[in-house]
Regions:
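Membrane-embedded alpha-helical bundles of multi-pass transporters/translocases
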Residues: 1-190
């Protein structure tokens, strides 16, 4: 029960950051920046949801059991092995999505009013969102480790810091990189 508030706040970080980015995006391309950020974030969220969150959710009960048993060595080894396995999956996926951001967006969205310019700005956002995959993976595994140890304070602090970093980076990058800067702010704040 004591973990409820920190867990709730931690799960709100990504939607809060997206809302912040969307607010900044509303000033770009006569409002089309909002669509670019949201469409790119949808693709990004599906990919990290399938891979990162699946791994994090599978590992949590095991970490909880090890924490209850006070098996510190296995706990640490499991976290290390999970981070290594995730890196093995996430780094190539990150690079692949960066390289293929334009074709992915074009295949999925380009039709009707979603023209080549929309593909260009949305793929730019997806390119930079992709950089956040490794950080998102690490953050999710380490948060689960803290929760398994009944420590909600660190993920809560991490979430609050993430939101602050995202705001600062949005302010600094939106003028220089438009939707790419907003997506990069989100990626770096993971």
């Amino acid at each position: 029960l004591m973990l409820m508030l920190p867990v709730m706040v931690s799960t709100w970080v990504q939607p809060i950051n997206l809302a912040i980015n969307t607010n900044f995006a509303s000033t770009l391309y006569e409002g089309s920046g909002v669509s670019a950020v949201n469409y790119a974030n949808t693709i990004y969220s599906i990919i990290v949801g399938v891979f990162v969150l699946s791994i994090a959710n599978v590992i949590f009960p095991r970490l909880s059991r090890m924490s209850i048993d006070n098996d510190k060595e296995s706990f640490g080894n499991t976290i290390s092995a999970t981070l290594e396995a995730m890196a093995f999956l996430i780094i190539p996926m990150t690079l692949g999505l960066m390289v293929l951001s334009s074709p992915v967006i074009s295949i999925i969205y380009e039709r009707g009013k979603f023209d080549s310019f929309a593909v260009e700005i949305t793929s730019k956002a997806l390119f930079y969102f992709s950089l956040g995959m490794p950080g998102f993976g690490i953050q999710n595994i380490l948060s689960r480790a803290f929760y398994a140890k009944q420590n909600g304070k660190m993920p809560l602090i991490s979430g609050i810091v993430s939101i602050g970093i995202n705001i600062v980076l949005c302010v600094l990058l939106v003028g220089k990189m438009d939707v790419g800067g907003l997506a990069l702010a989100s990626a770096l704040s993971q």
